[in-house]
Amino acid sequence: MADTHRVDRTDRHFQFQSPYEGGRGQGQYEGDRGYGGGGYKSMMPESGPSSTQVLSLLIGVPVVGSLLALAGLLLAGSVIGLMVALPLFLLFSPVIVPAALTIGLAMTGFLASGMFGLTGLSSISWVMNYLRGTRRTVPEQLEYAKRRMADAVGYAGQKGKEMGQHVQNKAQDVKQYDISKPHDTTTKGHETQGRTTAA
């Protein structure tokens, strides 16, 4: 009796196909109801990475790694240099800062006097040309004045850059001189002691 009630499941119309066999886009079973009609095969890449991708990866990883390592070393060196230079700057700042301020103020005074002199000379020139009756129109005069002022500003900016570089060089020279100068207090103490014993 048990054999008569058994259901034969072999008459189902499933046609299983491996995703690696057959043509592209075929379904896994009859009715073509897979994922997007392509089954598992449509979800898997068709081929591996190309040779150019592998080559660029093999070249890029060491280059990027070495650049990152170099950046880390430079950052560490900068921090160490700052830690060494900051106490020296604080130690010599009573000499460097007033000297830099004095030189900067003097150069600012020279530049200001030069600009005022150029402005005065251009004003006198304009007045003399006006009194002589030079037939210039107002826009030409304004253009001339603009060019003169632009030249004066460019000259002042160039001189300012040169003076800033000069001040920086002088400050570095003073710092190097103070660092290289020997500070031996023990010999002075022995000299004064020798003088007192000789007396």
UniProtKB/Swiss-Prot annotation:
Q: Where in the cell is it found?
A: Lipid droplet; Membrane
Query: Which biological process annotations from GO are given for this protein?
Result: lipid storage; response to freezing; seed germination; seed oilbody biogenesis
Keywords, sorted A to Z: Acetylation, Lipid droplet, Membrane, Transmembrane, Transmembrane helix
Positions of modified residues (N-acetylalanine): 2
Q: Where is this region: Disordered?
A: 1-31, 159-199
Q: How does it sit in the membrane?
A: Multi-pass membrane protein
Q: Which InterPro entries does the UniProt entry name for this protein?
A: Oleosin
- Tell me, in one coarse class, where this protein mainly resides: other
Transmembrane segment boundaries? 51-71, 72-92, 96-116
One term of GO molecular function = mRNA binding
Q: Does the entry annotate any disulfide bonds, and if so which pairs?
A: none
Segment Polar: which positions? 2-56
Q: Name one Pfam family in it.
A: Oleosin
Write out the biased-composition intervals (Gly residues).
22-31
Compositional bias (Basic and acidic residues) spans?
1-14, 172-193
Segments for region (Hydrophobic): 57-128
According to its record, what are the GO cellular component terms?
A: membrane; monolayer-surrounded lipid storage body
Q: What's this chain's function?
A: May have a structural role to stabilize the lipid body during desiccation of the seed by preventing coalescence of the oil. Probably interacts with both lipid and phospholipid moieties of lipid bodies. May also provide recognition signals for specific lipase anchorage in lipolysis during seedling growth.
The family database entries (PANTHER family) matched by this protein are listed as: OLEOSIN, OLEOSIN 21.2 KDA
| Family the entry assigns | Belongs to the oleosin family.
Q: What is this protein called?
A: Oleosin 21.2 kDa
